[in-house]
């Protein structure tokens, strides 16, 4: 802020002369911002239609002329900032819009997301586009990219990337578990970086696991089915990541070899593009819809794969320009989905260039060219076309090749519909769906990373044909059987999904290997273990994908080099079950017999499914018959090829993924294997159940993430310290389920018996497969069937494992590992449910009126802020909780709980206080986003849990904190502080780094007892324009600076301001004036002042009391919010502040004048209602009236001027109905005005009017000053000694009265030294009572001022 020349006059004059000063514009804007801080603020309530009950969020248009507000009535209102008129009502959301944002560069484009899971993009010129999340999960946050046609959507634990010209998002990334919900997304002003806020699993996992419906995976499945509309896509990405990881983990070279198989274009139509159910255009892209293109992953569907291959063939990348071109079309055109679809296929996405350029790096998960990813418009042809259009697709191809070269070959995931290339995630687990990628470079797995079991939906790998029920679409990369209608209904598809999910996990487990071993040796040998086969077959069958995908990928069904990639990916997630066979040191596809597993390394997977055979169809068929699908897959593959690739086996010895082929007989074995899976699982769908169980088990198997081999030896509940996070979660799940499912187990066990019988039968039918018991037996060894049942966890169960890098053993559960033993963990990590429950209880209790914001802040949930480089449009690896962490723990309530400055250099957010054991405290922290000190905490300020909204001013010099009401006890007040404004002044200065400026006050009706809370408070985007906030009462209030109350930025003003912001109730001595509320004080004060001035008769004595303590005792007060403890910040209106400032100035001036013996003491405004006369409250309480009695013909102003000129003031104190007058020189009753008056001491600026105040000058005398408050202030400011007649009293009396009203409060607050009642009360009738202790200070002047003019004051009036 320090600039060479801060003189605005010089800058402006130089500008007129044409001189250009570097930074002059910014300097002027800063001056404006600083200047307005001293101005009086005027609030304007916007008249909104329908009188909404609550206002949630505010967003400003790029031209700074419009503000959008979301309301509980499900509407969004667009208001003109300058006029305060509501211009548009956006109606259509079925539930409350929780977030809203304007496009930063396209005028008139607004995006909103509601609690019903609907995202709408509105063109204010007409038209809108909408997309629904799967299962209608609430939309937590939205963010437009400033330059690309890209909208980021945060919902649940997923981050979707949507080009709204398409029917649904083209990419999705997931966190490592469902507990790690994404709460906020934000681009920096240039779109170079992306900020994400994600729940720290450690905070909630233990306590919130219970929140997860752990009923069973079935529940999840059913839910998924019910959510059919919601595309499985996001789950698919998880799989994709998983697959990527696998393939990348496996020798990339093999993947390269295989990845290259030409993708076949066919199937594009069947593939649902991205699988996001486009509610509006599903028909348009039925096939394409099947294509799911995730984040930087290419669509896995055959079409996409084919197109990718084409792309590869046509390496031409989309032009960066294309990529940069965001279709900025605003208006309906931007929203016409169909055209956009075609257009999308035609036009490269903003991201295409990135991908085409970087596609080769498997490390980068870039967004495939948006358009490329999903040529929605054209189905097969579009894919075919896409290659040309979307050379970026080449990226996928190159990824495959380069990735392989890198050893991270992108995995060409064969969705049933086709092969998709999935670039290996940049970080194994981070980008996609949580697939916590396990790195299997050696075939050894680190702890498995789980996406939550719930991920299962998406788990059906594209390769998986879980969608079989659903034709090609289901298989396409994101498609999950559950999402497919057919699939949904088809338990097989469900279990396929589950299996896919589980398979990832299982792959990690030796157990699977053991299961395989029973047939495992065979498997490797060429016979699939029943378990393996089952897993693979069920998964594979469901997803003929791996085989057929590979084949489809190949186009031949012959082993394509890609298959390994596909398979590894699919295998892992879909293929289920690559199991690592320690004996063979290979990852083997469980359930598949790999006759030549070793012989055919990953690259050679000949997918049994005919290449580009409609894998979807095969998948569908298989899906239809859960039992059949393993067989079918095997059969189909065997039929297609003598050997069907059962799966990839990772050969640790060779360090490569090897294809395992299933013998034609595999089908039977697979069936048996499936049976094997099912037999023990008491789930409705044995597969589902077994999968659930296995998923849990699998997470448990590698109890020691570092020692898979020993995992089987571990007890079911091994030492948590040895558990990988996934295993740990699984263990907890199992425990939880064991508690919850006792009833469930009975029915499940019955089912299990039935399943076992049926499976036994199937086994007998398929002797070739290893007895299911054997395969299950391995698991059985680890756990008993009952346990297994318990293990079953819903897909949604929070089994997610932290990303690979995060291994947090016991800290979740064991208090000894917690940072502190307090009830409230800063990080909320405690595994003790009591912590969260206590927090919730306290939150509810402290809120009183049910402010959820406060409750959530008291609760121990915290979020991590991660800062992602988005310059290359790389997908953020949000599944990795350890990378790019900017703020490890913070509090997020809504999109207003975090703010990035307009210049992109500062980030303001609330963080938990240090571990004090109580969550009732938080800290406002401002971090640097500058590259040289990224993440450095510059400013801090302590607040309570009611601080929920933060906004940085346009110039980044001030920060406003919005406050939710948390008070339990209410008292009437006309002014309610809803926000506080601070100045950022000293980096690294601790609590002094931020200085309190003023309070934002919400005017309330005196009879309103409901406290007001702010949901969102924002600075208007233009410097000096003001601010706006939305309240829980439905108000949208715009506050603007209207005029200056003081002549300059006088430091005294600042102090005064703070003084006057003190709570009206004087805290001096901690005594509260009896019975008067601030609102009452204000009214009485104003009336008293007016009466005193003679402007209007007053029947009752004014209730304003003022003390004349010479020393202003500045009291730090929490401005009604527990948060503020600095200088008193009053919840009084800003205008009050201004007045107070003025009064302060006068006071200070008066101090100056004190030097002038003749100056009257600053008079303390005091008019107090009789009740307030209590000396306990104030030493002197008087109703001050103008010097002359109201009856005099002289008007009040001239009277005041005359009195001031005379060097003494006469004050009329009215009590009851009697009026007494005291001259400045004579102190009546103990009105004490100390000779030494500090700036803030005289609350009434008016005091300055008098000549130097006599030490004993009664506050009452000050009354006249009070009346003149403003004039006095002016005079004080302008002239020298208050005594000087020259002091102008320019301010209107009304203003004075306002000031006076303020000053009494201030006085009482400021003057800590009030004379004891008795002392002050003994008025000396004709003379000053120096005895007044405060007066004593002024003795020297007091005599001189004691004019016997003062009238006899009735003792009773001031009597002790």
From Swiss-Prot:
Subcellular location(s) of the protein: Endoplasmic reticulum; Cytoplasm, Cytoskeleton; Cytoplasmic vesicle, Autophagosome; Mitochondrion
Does the keyword Nucleus feature in the UniProt annotation? yes
| Residue interval(s) of motif TQT motif 1 | 1109-1111
Pathway linked to the protein = Protein modification; protein ubiquitination
Query: Which residues lie in Low complexity bias regions?
Result: 319-333, 428-437, 590-607, 1278-1288, 1329-1347
Which UniProt key words apply to this protein?
Autophagy, Cell cycle, Cell junction, Cytoplasm, Cytoplasmic vesicle, Cytoskeleton, Endoplasmic reticulum, Mitochondrion, Nucleus, Repeat, Ubl conjugation pathway, WD repeat
Composition bias type Acidic residues, residue spans? 775-784
User: Which Pfam families does the annotation name?
Assistant: WD40 (PF00400)
Result of knocking out the encoding gene: Morpholino knockdown of ambra1a and ambra1b results in reduced autophagy and increased apoptosis during embryogenesis. Morpholino knockdown of ambra1a and ambra1b results in impaired locomotion, caused by abnormal myogenesis.
Q: Motif TQT motif 2, which positions? A: 1121-1123
Where does the source fall among the domains of life? Eukaryota
Ranges for the region named Disordered are 249-277, 315-364, 412-490, 514-573, 587-616, 664-688, 754-796, 1120-1142, 1241-1360
Which InterPro entries does the record cross-reference, listed alphabetically? Answer: AMBRA1_autophagy, WD40/YVTN_repeat-like_dom_sf, WD40_repeat_CS, WD40_repeat_dom_sf, WD40_rpt
Q: Name one GO biological process term.
A: autophagosome assembly
Q: What is its main location?
A: endoplasmic reticulum
Q: Which GO terms describe its molecular function?
A: protein phosphatase activator activity; ubiquitin-like ligase-substrate adaptor activity
Q: Where is the composition biased (Basic and acidic residues)?
A: 1311-1321, 1348-1360
GO CC annotation, single: mitochondrion
Q: How does it assemble?
A: Component of the DCX(AMBRA1) E3 ubiquitin ligase complex.
Instruction: Please explain the role this protein plays, according to its UniProt record.
Output: Substrate-recognition component of a DCX (DDB1-CUL4-X-box) E3 ubiquitin-protein ligase complex involved in cell cycle control and autophagy. The DCX(AMBRA1) complex specifically mediates the polyubiquitination of target proteins. Acts as an upstream master regulator of the transition from G1 to S cell phase: ambra1b specifically recognizes and binds phosphorylated cyclin-D (ccnd1, ccnd2 and ccnd3), leading to cyclin-D ubiquitination by the DCX(AMBRA1) complex and subsequent degradation.
Q: Which family, according to UniProt?
A: Belongs to the WD repeat AMBRA1 family.
Q: What is this protein called?
A: Activating molecule in BECN1-regulated autophagy protein 1B
Q: Which gene encodes it?
A: ambra1b
């Amino acid at each position: 802020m320090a600039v060479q020349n801060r003189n605005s006059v010089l800058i402006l004059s130089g500008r007129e002369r044409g001189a250009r000063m570097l930074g002059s514009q910014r300097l002027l804007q800063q001056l404006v911002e600083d200047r307005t801080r001293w101005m009086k603020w005027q609030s304007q309530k916007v008249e909104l239609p329908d009188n909404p009950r609550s206002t949630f969020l505010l967003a400003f248009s790029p031209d700074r002329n419009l503000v959008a507000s979301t309301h509980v009535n499900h509407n969004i209102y667009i208001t003109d900032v300058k006029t305060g008129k509501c211009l548009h009502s956006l109606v259509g959301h079925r539930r409350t819009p929780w977030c809203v944002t304007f496009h930063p560069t396209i005028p008139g484009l607004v995006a909103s997301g509601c609690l019903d899971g609907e995202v709408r993009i509105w063109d204010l010129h007409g038209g809108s586009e909408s997309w629904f999340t799967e299962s209608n999960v609430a939309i937590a946050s939205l963010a437009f990219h400033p330059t690309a046609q890209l909208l980021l959507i945060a919902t649940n634990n997923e981050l979707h990337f949507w080009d709204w010209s398409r029917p649904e998002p083209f990419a999705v990334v997931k966190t490592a578990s469902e507990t790690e919900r994404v709460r906020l997304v934000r681009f920096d002003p240039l779109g170079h970086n992306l900020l994400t806020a994600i729940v720290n699993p450690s905070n909630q996992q233990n306590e919130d696991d219970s929140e997860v419906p752990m009923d069973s995976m079935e529940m999840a499945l059913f839910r998924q089915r019910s959510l059919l509309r919601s595309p499985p896509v996001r789950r698919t990405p998880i799989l994709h990541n998983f697959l990527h990881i696998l393939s990348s983990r496996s020798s990339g070279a093999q993947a390269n070899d295989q990845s290259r198989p030409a993708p076949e274009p066919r199937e594009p139509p069947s593939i649902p593009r991205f699988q996001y159910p486009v509610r509006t255009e599903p028909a348009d892209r039925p096939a394409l819809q099947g294509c799911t293109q995730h984040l930087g992953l290419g669509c896995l569907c055959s079409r996409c794969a084919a197109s990718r291959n084409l792309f590869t063939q046509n390496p031409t990348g989309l032009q960066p320009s294309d990529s940069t071109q965001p279709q900025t079309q605003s208006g309906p055109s931007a929203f016409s989905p169909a055209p956009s679809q075609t257009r999308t296929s035609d036009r490269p996405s903003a991201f295409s260039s990135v991908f085409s350029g970087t596609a080769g790096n498997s490390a980068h998960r870039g967004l495939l060219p948006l358009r490329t990813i999903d040529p929605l418009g054209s189905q097969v042809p579009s894919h075919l076309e896409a290659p040309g259009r979307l050379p970026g697709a080449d990226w996928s191809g190159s990824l495959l090749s380069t990735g392989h070269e890198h050893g991270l070959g992108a995995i060409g995931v064969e969705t049933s519909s086709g092969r998709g290339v999935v670039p290996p995630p940049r970080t194994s687990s981070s980008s996609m769906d949580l697939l916590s990628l396990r790195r299997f470079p050696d075939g050894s797995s680190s702890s498995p990373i789980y996406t939550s079991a719930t991920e299962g939906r998406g788990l059906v790998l594209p390769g998986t044909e879980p969608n079989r029920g659903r034709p090609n679409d289901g298989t396409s990369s994101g498609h999950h059987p559950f999402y497919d209608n057919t699939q949904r209904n088809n338990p097989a598809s469900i279990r396929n999904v589950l299996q896919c999910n589980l398979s990832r996990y299982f792959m990690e487990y030796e157990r699977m290997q053991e299961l395989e071993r029973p047939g495992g040796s065979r498997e490797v040998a060429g016979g699939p273990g029943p378990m393996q086969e089952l897993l693979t077959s069920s998964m594979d069958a469901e997803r003929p994908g791996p085989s057929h995908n590979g084949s489809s990928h190949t186009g031949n069904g012959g082993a394509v080099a890609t298959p390994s990639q596909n398979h590894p990916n699919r295998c892992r997630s879909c293929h289920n079950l690559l199991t690592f066979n320690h004996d063979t040191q290979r990852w083997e596809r469980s359930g598949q017999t790999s006759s030549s597993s070793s012989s055919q390394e990953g690259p050679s997977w000949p997918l049994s499914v005919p290449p580009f055979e409609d894998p979807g169809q095969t998948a569908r068929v298989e899906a239809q018959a859960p039992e059949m699908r393993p067989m079918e897959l095997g059969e189909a593959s065997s039929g297609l090829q003598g050997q069907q690739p059962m799966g990839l086996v990772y050969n640790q010895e060779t360090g490569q993924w090897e294809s395992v082929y299933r013998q034609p007989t595999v089908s039977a074995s697979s069936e048996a294997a499936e049976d094997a899976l099912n037999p023990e699982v008491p789930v409705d769908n044995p597969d589902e159940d077994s999968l659930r169980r296995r998923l849990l088990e699998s997470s448990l198997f590698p109890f020691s993430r570092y020692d898979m081999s020993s995992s089987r030896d571990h007890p079911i509940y091994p030492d948590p310290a040895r558990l990988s996070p996934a295993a740990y979660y699984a263990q907890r799940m199992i425990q939880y389920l064991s508690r919850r499912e006792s009833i469930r187990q009975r029915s499940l066990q019955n089912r299990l018996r039935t399943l076992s019988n049926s499976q036994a039968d199937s086994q007998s039918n398929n002797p070739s497969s290893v007895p299911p018991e054997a395969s299950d037996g391995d698991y059985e060894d680890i756990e008993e069937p009952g346990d297994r049942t318990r293990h079953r966890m819903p897909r949604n169960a929070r089994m997610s494992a932290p990303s690979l890098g995060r291994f947090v053993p016991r800290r979740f559960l064991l208090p000894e590992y917690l940072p502190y033993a307090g009830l409230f963990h800063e990080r909320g990590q405690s595994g003790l449910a009591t912590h969260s429950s206590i927090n919730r209880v306290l939150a509810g209790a402290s809120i009183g009126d049910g402010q959820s914001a406060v409750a959530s802040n008291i609760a121990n949930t915290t979020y991590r802020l991660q800062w992602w480089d988005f310059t290359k449009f790389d997908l953020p690896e949000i599944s990795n909780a350890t990378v790019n962490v900017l703020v490890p723990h913070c509090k997020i309530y809504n999109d207003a709980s975090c703010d990035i400055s307009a210049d992109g250099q500062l980030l303001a957010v609330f963080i938990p206080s240090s571990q004090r054991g109580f969550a009732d405290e938080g800290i406002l922290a401002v971090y640097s986003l500058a590259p040289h000190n990224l993440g450095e905490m510059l400013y801090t300020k302590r607040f309570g849990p009611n601080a929920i909204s933060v906004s940085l001013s346009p110039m980044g010099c001030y920060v406003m904190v919005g406050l939710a009401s948390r008070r339990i006890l209410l008292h009437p007040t006309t002014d309610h502080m809803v926000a506080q404004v601070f100045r950022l002044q000293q980096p690294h200065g601790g609590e002094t780094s931020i200085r309190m400026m003023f309070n934002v006050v919400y005017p309330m009706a005196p009879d309103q007892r409901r406290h007001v809370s702010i949901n969102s408070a924002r600075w208007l985007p233009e410097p000096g324009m003001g601010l706006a906030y939305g309240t829980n009462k439905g108000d949208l209030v715009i506050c603007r600076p209207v005029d200056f109350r003081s002549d300059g930025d006088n430091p005294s003003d600042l102090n005064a301001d703070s003084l006057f912001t003190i709570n009206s109730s004087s805290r001096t001595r901690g005594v509260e004036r009896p019975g008067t509320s601030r609102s009452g004080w204000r009214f009485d004060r104003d009336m008293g002042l007016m009466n005193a001035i003679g402007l209007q008769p007053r029947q009752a004595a004014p209730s304003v009391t003022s003390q004349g303590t010479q020393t202003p005792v500045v009291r730090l007060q929490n401005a009604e919010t527990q948060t503020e403890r600095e200088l008193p910040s009053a919840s009084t209106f800003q205008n009050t502040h201004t007045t107070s400032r003025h009064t302060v100035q006068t006071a200070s001036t008066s101090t100056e004048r004190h030097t002038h013996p003749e100056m009257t003491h600053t008079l303390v405004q005091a008019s107090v209602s009789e009740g307030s006369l209590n000396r306990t409250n104030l030493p002197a309480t008087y109703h001050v009236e103008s010097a002359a009695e109201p009856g005099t013909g002289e008007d009040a102003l001239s009277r005041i001027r005359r009195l001031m000129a005379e060097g003494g003031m006469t004050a009329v104190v009215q009590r009851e109905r009697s009026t007494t007058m005291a001259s400045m020189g004579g102190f009546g009753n103990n009105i004490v005005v100390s000779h030494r008056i500090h700036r803030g001491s005289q609350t009434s600026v008016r005091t300055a009017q008098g000549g130097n105040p006599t030490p004993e000058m009664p506050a009452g005398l000050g009354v006249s000053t009070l009346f003149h408050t403003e004039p006095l202030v002016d005079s004080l400011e302008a002239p020298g000694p208050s005594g000087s007649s020259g002091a102008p009293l320019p301010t209107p009396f009304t203003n004075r009265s306002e000031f006076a009203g303020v000053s009494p409060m201030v006085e009482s607050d400021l003057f800590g030294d009030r004379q004891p009642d008795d002392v002050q009360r003994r008025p000396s009738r004709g003379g000053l009572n120096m005895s007044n202790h405060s007066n004593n200070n002024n003795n020297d002047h007091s005599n001189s001022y004691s004019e016997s003019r003062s009238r006899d004051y009735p003792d009773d009036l001031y009597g002790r």
